Design a protein with these regions (language model features):
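Cofactor-binding loop segments of dinucleotide-utilizing enzymes, especially the Rossmann-like FAD-
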Residues: 9, 97, 118
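ATP-binding/phosphotransfer module of carbohydrate and carboxylate kinases, centering on a glycine-rich
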Residues: 1-49, 88, 108-109, 150-154, ...
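Short, acidic Gly/Pro/Ser/Thr-rich loop/turn segments
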Residues: 2, 60-62, 122-123
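Short, acidic, Ser/Thr-enriched surface-loop or helix-capping motifs
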Residues: 8, 63, 127
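Activation segment
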Residues: 64-65, 72, 136, 166, ...
Length: 194
């Protein structure tokens, strides 16, 4: 899925749209993305006042370079995202998806906060004193690879016992429930199968 969000300088959402578009590294994917963005902005007045585009990506991004160092979800490694600026003719800023979600929170109100991202993989982000903490290698919120169960289940990264092997949506919905919503409902109902 791809989500388009138009946000004003007060961090208020002006417009939102989500479309189903399977990721691809093919040029046709980026052409379609550009078309969808133009369609999304078609009825927006003062488009010349748009300052830039933020793109959140599931993976580790090298700050300032637009290099996706690694993304398990997209199955990419050392992939340059820089060409997207030419695709959109606006400044483009890249950020990890969980970090983007953390920054979307009211960091003036929640000075110290933790965000957990539960998707195909387990991710997260946190802030201290209203500042996003990313760490030297941009992995500070990668909670999915903290060892939860020593010598436990094998994770896709090759290590044993990573939190991701137990807490990612795919792990929570394997044989027990068909969907994440069903799993959450089982938790609410305090069912032992959850």
């Amino acid at each position: 899925h791809v989500g388009f969000v138009l946000v004003n300088l007060k961090s208020e959402i002006e417009k939102y749209k989500r479309i189903r578009l399977e990721f691809s590294t093919e040029a046709s994917y980026y052409s379609r993305l550009r078309e969808e963005l133009h369609h999304f902005l078609a009825d927006v007045e003062n488009q010349d006042r748009i300052l830039g585009i933020g793109i959140s990506v599931p993976g580790i991004i090298k700050p300032g370079d637009g290099i996706l160092i690694k993304s398990h979800a997209l199955q990419l490694e050392n992939y340059s995202l820089g060409f997207l600026e030419q695709t959109f003719s606006l400044p483009v800023y890249f950020v990890n998806d969980a970090n983007a979600a953390m920054m979307a929170e009211d960091l003036d109100r929640y000075k110290n906060a933790l965000y957990l991202s539960l998707n195909n993989t387990l991710g997260g982000a946190f802030c201290i004193d209203g500042k996003l903490i990313q760490g030297e290698n941009q992995k500070a919120g990668e909670f999915g690879h903290m060892i939860l169960v020593p010598e436990g289940k094998q994770c896709y990264c090759g290590k044993l016992g990573c939190a991701d092997a137990y807490c990612a949506a795919s792990a929570l919905t394997d044989e027990k429930c068909q969907t994440l919503e069903q799993f959450m409902k089982s938790l609410e109902n305090k069912e032992t199968k959850a």
